Amino acid sequence: MAEPYFIKAGLLPENPDEATRTWFAKVVALLAPSVNKLDELPERAGLIFKVDAAGALAAADNAEVLGGAKANEVLATFIEMAEADKSTMTPERFKAIMNDVKAKTETKGKDLFHPVRIVFTGSHSGPEFDKLIPILEEGSQLPLPVHVMNTQERIAAFKVARSAS
């Protein structure tokens, strides 16, 4: 039911293949609880389809999180650990990295997770990582009109934007 809105927005091809349809069902399931009407889904899907690392760093609503006492240490440690292993990010791998970041930085809760969420979505709030990460990884492999950046691409873009700011 949401497919026509994504096609009109240029986010899905006119005739998606089966893999794209299966992936798209996961996208809708992830985002539907956060909208009131189906036509709001493509805009909400911006966190999947549109990456603006510089904009995320400059966003006023992210300032408090990024200005937190441990935010720079958490981000630097996360980026270093995630880049060290070039394998595809999975929820399990992410959890292991975050446990290592937690131990190394002695940070937990929102001070640990919100800065990393900004790397992946451009916002300090959003979907659960265990649901989002597979969508990003799978989407990056599909023939979509707009490329979905996987987690490594998002980390790289954030690192570049962060060094430029």
Model regions: which residues?
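Conserved nucleotide- and phosphate/pyrophosphate-binding catalytic cores
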Residues: 1-165
